[in-house]
Amino acid sequence: LPEVIKMLKNVPVDVCNAATRLHCTCGYQISVGLKTKNIPPYLWWYIYDEDIIPARVYSPSLKSPDNAPEGCSSLQMEVYCNRDEYTQEELLARSVGKLVSLNILKEEDILFTDIRFESYANVIFDHNIYEARKIVRDYLSSVGIETIGRFGEWGYLWSDQSLMSGLKVEM
């Protein structure tokens, strides 16, 4: 929503101010391709350790066997931080490297790693969100812009909920 407001001209000051009060996390997604199916049997799992920087680990290959080649698996780790807070070497050492040191992964099973920065990860639900979100969305609606999805509704929507959000506008 803040990005949409920045694109428009002649937006009322109160709407611009409300948009600046909407916040979200950003961070890195670290993907690991593995030549084994021997991974933790959890679709999502959370890590509460300051030395291991991913907050959450997800296994796309557990979600669907079509998400990895036969005999292989995959993990994706979410690290919430600012861009350039860590070097790529630090990201790998404090995520994949930690899982190896804990015997969760074996170094020899790693086929590849991939690191990507996501500017918009999760909406932050702070004290300002409800009032600020309403001001911004009401204004956009008043000028004929309907917003959809996680960052259009500025809420914690999963992929299917984001899709339904768009379909509701179409109907």
Residue ranges and their predicted role:
Residues 1-90, 94-102, 135, 139:
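Mid-domain catalytic core of redox enzymes
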Residues 59-171:
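Conserved flavin/dinucleotide-binding core of flavoenzymes
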